[in-house]
Amino acid sequence: MTNALEIRNLKKSFGNLEVIKDLSLTAKKGEVICIIGTSGSGKSTLLRCVNLLETPDSGEVYVNGELIKMKKDKNGKLIPVEQNQVDRIRSKLSMVFQDFNLWSHMTVLQNVIEAPIHVQKIEKNVARKNGYLLLEKVGIAEKADQYPSKLSGGQQQ
């Protein structure tokens, strides 16, 4: 069975600060893993490296058995080989950011459907239908046409 996520010997530093030190882990499909650590220990950086919001200094990341292809640029920094591969893999991953990051000028529903329309290229009417279903699932469908400023902190999350 192919692993959902496999990380091999991942390293990431910011200047002289080594944040991720030769980390390896495997998560099988359906398996739940927890990443626990103190503030500043690299948990968010690890997730950002998996999504390539940050590029690791070295190591390999596999998503559903597929290696994210990286190469060194002229300065020796790792960069993705194929942006199409990055976009495709990102469309299969999810990440909840520490901050709410809702667009204040967009309604709740517009915030929910923005990524599916632009990243996954889902048709707007399909995204709206799915968006309402998701809002129903978390109990805030009645807030679909309101703006984030009208939601509680928990509802925004």
Model-derived features: positions:
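Short coil-to-helix segment of the ABC ATPase nucleotide-binding domain corresponding to the Q-loop/switch region
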Residues: M106-E114
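Conserved ABC ATPase "signature" region
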Residues: E66-M70, N75-P80, K124-K143
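Conserved ABC ATPase signature
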Residues: H105, Q146-Q156
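ABC nucleotide-binding domain "signature motif"
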Residues: D57-I68
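The feature captures the beta-strand-to-loop junction immediately N-terminal to the Walker
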Residues: I36-T38
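Helix-to-loop junction immediately C-terminal to a conserved catalytic motif
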Residues: N51
